[in-house]
Amino acid sequence: MSKILKDLEFTFTGKRYGTDGNDDIDAIGFGGIIYAGKGHDTITVGTFAVTAYTGDGHDFVRGGSAYLKIIDENGDLDVRGLNAWGEIEKSGHGDLKYVGASAAIKINHTGYEYGNINYSGAAIANIITRKGAISNINYQGAGGYNQIWHETNTGNMTFKGGGGYNKLVRTWFNSYQNSKGNINFEGLGGGNGIFSRV
């Protein structure tokens, strides 16, 4: 089946299946579910609501929607766009990069081995969580409420931006005695709660 027919399948059925190769997927329509499979995939969304299972590989997701949820495993993930509400869940190793704007964005990276989070954007609420062995978090942006929970044994947190209230927590994952990492805060806030347990 050609790419055009596969993309039209999403428009009319709300489902789009990729391969285990490097796919270029356009998801345009009211909404639905994307199963990208393995490989290095590029996904362009223009929908009311979509959930994308990006699997393994280095994946790039771009576009806009009222609701966007991405579920990723191993490999780097790059997300860019404008969404009213966004959720990103990453369970395997690899970096996660987000560039965009939204009313609210929730990022949860639980890959054990390694994987940084790089955030650049703005939202009324930014909720960022990283749990694993090794990771840095770099935040540049603005939000009404910013919450960053950094739970790794090794890694630094850098915050550059502003918010109505900023809550930053740096803690250890599974080895307190060997944990290390700094918090670098360069920002403004109506209120700031900054805590380090390493």
Residue ranges, per PLM feature:
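Extended low-polarity, hydrophobic cluster-rich segments
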Residues: 33, 49-52, 66-68, 86, ...
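Glycine-centered beta-turn/loop sites at beta-strand termini
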Residues: 18, 27, 36-37, 45, ...
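Conserved positions within tandem-repeat grammars
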Residues: 59, 77, 86, 105, ...
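N-terminal segments that cap or nucleate solenoid repeat domains
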Residues: 2-48
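Short, well-ordered alpha-helix to beta-strand connector turns
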Residues: 13, 22, 31, 40, ...
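Intrinsic low-complexity/IDR segments
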Residues: 3-9, 114, 172, 180-184, ...
